[in-house]
């Protein structure tokens, strides 16, 4: 947990602090077309200081059986996985009303 996050949460336990951080984020899931018509699912709006993007990207890639990466504060997954990503993020504790799928 970063120093900035602990200063925001004061003396709260790390688990509770992490949950509060998740509830305050607005996550956008969108689809981009790349070269040769390939589709890439983009997940934006996650705060790198509050969520471990590398760990989250790894979890999403394994659960979706796809390739992907994280860079520039966003996660990129190969293929169109917008609706499934939303379901997985809700299972992981992110509030459904804070996850927006851009059609």
From Swiss-Prot:
Keyword match Iron: no
Q: Name one GO molecular function term.
A: translation initiation factor activity
Q: Which Pfam family, any one of them, does this sequence belong to? A: SUI1
- One biological process GO term for this chain? regulation of translation
What keywords tag this UniProt record?
Answer: Protein biosynthesis, Translation regulation
The record, for PROSITE patterns, names: SUI1
Give the highest taxon in the source lineage. Archaea
Q: Which family does it belong to?
A: Belongs to the SUI1 family.
**Designated name of the protein:** Protein translation factor SUI1 homolog
Q: What is the lineage of its organism?
A: Archaea, Thermoproteota, Thermoprotei, Desulfurococcales, Pyrodictiaceae
